[in-house]
Amino acid sequence: HSLSKTRYYLYFYDGRRSRIARNVIEVQDGGEENGVFSANMYAYLEDLSNYYQCKLLYHGTMRRGDTFVNFNFENQNNKVERAFLYAIHSFSNGGRMEGLCCCLSTQPILPACFKFLLSSEILEETEELKEKLKVSKEDIRLLKKMNMFVISDHV
């Protein structure tokens, strides 16, 4: 029997290109082992309906808890590069999860961390979404106070 897949749409704001970056994460349903699911991330998509035409492909895992979900991915073109995503799993925001991704930026090559929004449905790419994905004054205030980048508000 074939396993079904759950698809998530991941959005973040890429300040280098001044636009929202589109990504798709596919999670293998029913294939979990000790709460760990197999997952793929198709990164930097022009067209969400044709996500096999991605600029970067990652293979990895997803772990789901009561309040958080995390993904651990390995870049298939550069095995040294990994992406770790942590999202707040809230039931009150219509299938959307806000989180942080830590990875290696390619241009320039530096460790990086950015906010993202994960949705079970395709989102309209509005100015409101763009502002939500950008680093806010509150994000900077908390960064200075706590000396760490944290997600301060919920979707």
Where are these regions (language model features)?
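Helix-turn-helix/homeodomain-like alpha-helical modules used for DNA recognition
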Residues: 1-49, 57
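C-terminal regulatory/effector modules of DNA-binding transcriptional regulators
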Residues: 51-155
